[in-house]
C-alpha cells in the first residue's frame, strides 16, 4: 500500500481535521477487527501476543485493543514485555557484529520466565510480573504487579519479540498480532518517502521529547535497530493471525516542524548516513498541520505527547 503525496497535501490544506478523523477512523476499525478475532480465539487461549518493530505504536494499540475488549464485556490486562528484560551482564550479554551489547536481541529477555508465566496464566495461576529499570539496566526486587485471570479474561503481552519462535512454538494457541508503520508515500508513481521513515521519525521525536536523547544518539542506533528488526522481528510476522499497518497519511504534516529541526544536522560518518540525509528533503515535501487538531487518544500522541495513554 502507498499513500499519494498530492492527496495528502490537498487534504492537509483543505480539511485538516476531517483528514485526521478519517485516518484515525481507519485505524480504529482495524483495532475493532482485532478485538473480535481475539474474542473468537479466546476459547483456545487467553493470551494475546502483540509484536512489531520500534516506533510502530504497539503500546497505544495494545491499550486500545484492551479497551475494545472491555466494551465487549471482556476484561483485558496489559503487560509490557520490556519488564522481562534480564539484568545486563556484560560477560554473557549478546553482542552486535561490532562487539557492542545487542539490546535488540531476544536473548536479552527472560524467555524461561515468560513461558512459565504464559503457562501459569492459562492454568488460572497468579503471576508476579518483574520490574525492569532501564536507567540502571537491571531488574529490581519488587515486582511491578501481579495478575490472575478469571474466567473469560484476556491478557495482552506487547513487545518487539512477542512472535519469536522461542515463545510461539510453546504457546501455539495464543492469538498473534503484528503491527508496523510500513506504507510508502508516492508522487507520480515514485516513492518519495519510505515507509520505514515513519518509524524512524516517530522514534527520534519521542526519544528527544521524553527520553532525553539528542537526535545524534537516536540516529546512531538506527542501523542496529534495523539489523535487529530484519533478524529478530520481521521473520516472524507471517506467523501473526492478524497484521495491520499503523501509519497515518497525516502524521508527517503533524510532526513536520519538530522532525525538521531534529534532522537538520546529521553527523557525517554515521552508519546509514546516505539514507538518513534523505529524510530532511523528504519532510519538506509535506505541509504542516497543527498538532492541537490531533485527538488525545490518537496513536501518534504516543510520539508527540499530550495523549491520554501516557
Predicted regions and their residues:
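Charged, amphipathic alpha-helical linker segments immediately N-terminal to NTP-binding catalytic cores
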Residues: 1-33
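Conserved NTP phosphate-binding and transfer environment spanning the P-loop NTPase/kinase superfamily
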Residues: 16-21, 28, 162-310
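Conserved lysine of the Walker
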Residues: 58
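Conserved nucleotide-sensing/catalytic segment adjacent to the nucleotide-binding pocket
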Residues: 77-79, 86-135, 154
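Hydrophobic positions on the alpha1 helix immediately C-terminal to the Walker A/P-loop
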Residues: 61-65, 80
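Hydrophobic anchor at the beta1->P-loop junction of P-loop NTPases
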Residues: 48-50
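Glycine-rich phosphate-binding loop used to anchor ATP phosphates in small-molecule kinases
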Residues: 115-173, 219-236
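Post-Walker A helix-loop "phosphate-sensing" segment adjacent to the P-loop in P-loop NTPases
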Residues: 67-77
Amino acid at each position: 500500500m502507498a499513500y499519494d503525496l498530492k492527496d495528502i497535501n490537498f487534504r492537509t490544506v483543505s480539511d485538516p481535521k476531517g483528514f485526521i478523523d478519517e485516518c484515525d477512523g481507519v485505524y480504529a476499525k482495524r483495532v475493532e477487527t482485532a478485538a473480535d478475532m481475539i474474542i473468537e480465539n479466546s476459547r483456545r487461549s487467553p493470551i494475546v501476543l502483540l509484536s512489531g518493530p520500534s516506533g510502530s505504536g504497539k503500546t497505544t494499540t495494545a491499550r486500545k485493543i484492551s479497551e475494545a475488549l472491555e466494551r465487549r464485556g471482556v476484561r483485558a490486562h496489559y503487560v509490557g514485555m520490556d519488564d522481562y528484560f534480564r539484568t545486563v551482564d556484560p560477560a554473557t550479554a549478546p553482542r552486535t557484529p561490532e562487539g557492542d551489547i545487542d539490546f535488540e536481541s531476544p536473548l536479552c529477555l527472560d524467555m524461561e520466565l515468560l513461558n512459565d508465566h504464559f503457562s501459569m496464566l492459562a492454568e488460572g495461576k497468579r503471576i508476579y510480573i518483574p520490574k525492569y529499570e532501564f536507567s540502571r539496566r537491571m531488574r529490581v526486587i519488587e515486582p511491578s504487579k501481579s495478575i490472575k485471570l478469571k474466567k473469560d479474561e484476556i491478557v495482552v503481552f506487547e513487545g518487539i519479540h512477542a512472535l519469536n519462535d522461542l515463545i510461539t512454538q510453546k504457546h501455539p494457541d495464543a492469538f498473534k498480532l503484528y503491527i508496523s508503520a510500513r506504507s510508502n508515500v508516492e508522487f507520480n508513481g515514485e516513492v518519495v518517502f519510505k515507509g520505514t521513515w515513519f518509524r524512524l521519525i516517530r522514534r527520534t521525536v519521542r526519544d528527544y521529547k521524553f527520553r532525553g536523547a539528542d537526535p545524534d544518539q537516536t540516529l546512531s542506533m538506527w542501523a542496529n535497530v534495523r539489523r535487529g528488526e530484519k533478524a529478530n522481528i520481521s521473520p516472524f510476522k507471517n506467523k501473526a493471525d492478524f497484521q495491520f499497518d499503523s501509519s497515518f497519511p497525516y502524521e508527517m504534516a503533524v510532526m513536520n516542524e519538530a522532525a525538521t529541526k531534529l534532522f537538520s544536522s546529521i553527523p557525517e560518518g554515521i552508519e546509514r548516513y546516505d539514507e538518513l540525509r534523505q529524510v530532511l528533503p523528504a519532510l519538506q515535501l509535506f505541509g504542516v498541520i497543527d498538532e492541537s487538531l490531533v485527538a488525545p487518544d490518537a496513536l501518534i500522541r504516543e510520539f508527540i505527547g499530550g495523549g491520554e495513554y501516557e
